[in-house]
Amino acid sequence: MEGEGVQPPDENLENGSRPRFKWKKVLRLVVSGIKAAGLLLCVVYVCLQFSSSPAKDSPIQRLRAPVTGCEGGRLFIGTSKNEYETMEVQNNSVIINCDGLYLIHLKGSFFQEVKINLHFRKDRSPIFVPMLNNGQRVVFTVVTSLAFKDEVYLTVNASDTLCEHLQINDGELIIVQLTPNGYCAPERPYSSTVNQVPL
Amino acid sequence: MEGEGVQPPDENLENGSRPRFKWKKVLRLVVSGIKAAGLLLCVVYVCLQFSSSPAKDSPIQRLRAPVTGCEGGRLFIGTSKNEYETMEVQNNSVIINCDGLYLIHLKGSFFQEVKINLHFRKDRSPIFVPMLNNGQRVVFTVVTSLAFKDEVYLTVNASDTLCEHLQINDGELIIVQLTPNGYCAPERPYSSTVNQVPL
Amino acid sequence: MEGEGVQPPDENLENGSRPRFKWKKVLRLVVSGIKAAGLLLCVVYVCLQFSSSPAKDSPIQRLRAPVTGCEGGRLFIGTSKNEYETMEVQNNSVIINCDGLYLIHLKGSFFQEVKINLHFRKDRSPIFVPMLNNGQRVVFTVVTSLAFKDEVYLTVNASDTLCEHLQINDGELIIVQLTPNGYCAPERPYSSTVNQVPL
């Protein structure tokens, strides 16, 4: 019977190659240990990437809009649907959604002497815009700190001309955020009151 | 004979520890299932990363060049081999390769009254540069939208002096892109007509 | 005895399903090969990510500080603890740590005519700041190249008033780096000589 004559298969191995078989077992253990560690490393890394996926940088806030006239005492800021539009214009005011330092540039030529003030925050005095060519031309660049809820608009007055009769040539307003990645208010549905003007 | 006395090895197990053996088999299945899922997750993630490797941000387009004289009615724009050079100068024109909003800054002092115009696009009127100190000094900053194929150059004229006789002190032109990651034309081999000037 | 009647378990398989068994073995080899390759790919990718983890972009260097008076012939630059402070002010000088192109903006109103010069490097002539409103108002924007060890400060003099008696309204200095990721000196411990002023 087997018990006396025929040894179970494993026993046959052990006599002749017991150390080889042990070494093989250790090797197999080490390999699967390494494989498990490698897999664990990868899975942990992937999970970390997903959980800490870098907050998508908010796009640089910017606006480039034609300034084409005067309406209700304010310069009329048109908007043009091109890739520079990441800021909204409402009632000739540029709505600020993200905190940061902004570059504001205004240029244009008038047919009469005008005085322009740049407003951006209720409790702050406006910036009086220096003019050129006896008050008939503006090429003005300023840097200021703006924050969510600010609204940038430009009031204009001419001593002898009604606002609505003011004519402007080559008028343009550019606002660019210089320090992106500050606080940004959640985006609101784009309202329809913007002044659609072909650029 | 075996049939009566000696059972095959597996049968020996089953009687005494059949549930334990089944449980081991299920465990082994679950473990290898988890390992396979983990591996699949990692491989899919790695492939996604490779396939969607974020387009390398194009470097911010910028130029800082000395303005040292006048040539052919244009201010002579030298170029200096330093890390600010990502834009090419040809025939005293700065070649624009990437769309975006740019800050252009010009400064310098002349020995006579001059008038400078900033040109950047064929079908657009140039920007008349306001001067200081009776037209003998310029410290001018403007923001404008430039696009591929635009060329920035500065025409200068003085009522009583030939262009080539104009002398400029501390002249410098700086152009910096404020909104990188717009469209960029594929890079062309750098041509040799630029004006090499030690800064 | 076994030799004649009872074959070892493997032998039983071979006769009837030898090709099936071989095919299974090949399949198992292929699967573990794929698993090993997949695991290797992931581990190599993860290691590459760790070893080449993108140098953390240095934050855009910027300062927005109130300018509130005059001290030792220099405009007094206060500092306010808000998120715009990534630059240090010492002895009314803004310390430059990172190379790059910077936008410098100064605004303010005085009660007398003043002359202001913008200094930033020992061996460079200062920039004479153009004034408005008969020298009593400044709204000035300039772009210049600054480097580690530069110090930005503003000297001011008034023909008939002592520096310490000069009064300024709505004075503000803003400095913003336009080309981040240039060379930055290692950060030094923040010194205590800065002028703490509530903004």
Swiss-Prot record, chains A, B, C:
Residues 59-176 form the THD domain. InterPro entries: TNF_CS, TNF_dom, TNFSF4, Tumour_necrosis_fac-like_dom. Residues 49-199 are extracellular. One of its GO terms (cellular component) is cell surface. GO terms for molecular function: cytokine activity; tumor necrosis factor receptor binding; tumor necrosis factor receptor superfamily binding. Keywords: Cytokine, Disulfide bond, Glycoprotein, Membrane, Signal-anchor, Transmembrane, Transmembrane helix. Detected in T-cell lines, but not in a macrophage cell line. Disulfide bonds join C70-C163, C98-C184. Signal peptide: none annotated. Glycans are attached at N91, N157. Residues 1-25 are cytoplasmic. Its main location: membrane. SUPFAM superfamilies: TNF-like. Belongs to the tumor necrosis factor family. Homotrimer. This is Tumor necrosis factor ligand superfamily member 4. The lineage of its organism: Eukaryota, Metazoa, Chordata, Craniata, Vertebrata.
